[in-house]
């Protein structure tokens, strides 16, 4: 718990029985809010009451172990003179900001002197801006993959990487999308602890979310375009291989025909007993094969 100039910030790292009882003892929130706290994962939302608001936000978070994006769920109770932040799961996002405020008197003063609404703005703003490295990392990965593709790296591993990057972009956008409307609603709510002066701050967060939404939309289009390019290049390689195999089979047809005829166990075949004729026949077949290859080359089938 942090206190500054009539404002109390309570941060709950884990919603266990002790934390639950603390909230019920010290704050008179609606019973539906308490049910939400115990109900596991919740969708992003704002519940507006006479004396307080209850918010649930989702923040994109990078998970190194799986190289994927997950969402961290955060809850807020905000009223006149207090802010309660609740963290679900194993994320340390809120905890880091809480300790930063606790250990740095300047940050504590700047964040908490202007009331609970401004403190909530600073927390939400910091949380969303903390996702910037995720966006930059995805952009670098896509740029590097694009260069490799046009250097000739088009294989199953490339297709797999494209699928992973596309999954991460879609997950990021799926998490961010509801938050844009939620933050937009916050800028229009009028309470004693959320006055009109705070609207510009929440609009600024919304502008940032719109910016990263636009960036990820570009990334998604780039990935889709690269996927089509890789498919086309791989199909082209496959077609060239099939063409080469077809040419080989066509070129060997005369040899197959003659070997089939003279390989039969029959008598009376022309020049079957003449060794010189056999060699002449091989030379003739070789000439036919070369002629077929030249014709195919001129017609650009090779």
Task: Show the residue positions of the predicted features.
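Peripheral, non-transmembrane regulatory/ligand-interaction domains of membrane transport proteins
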Residues: 1-197, 201-204, 208-218, 301-302
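Hydrophobic alpha-helical transmembrane segments and their immediately adjacent juxtamembrane loops
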Residues: 207-302
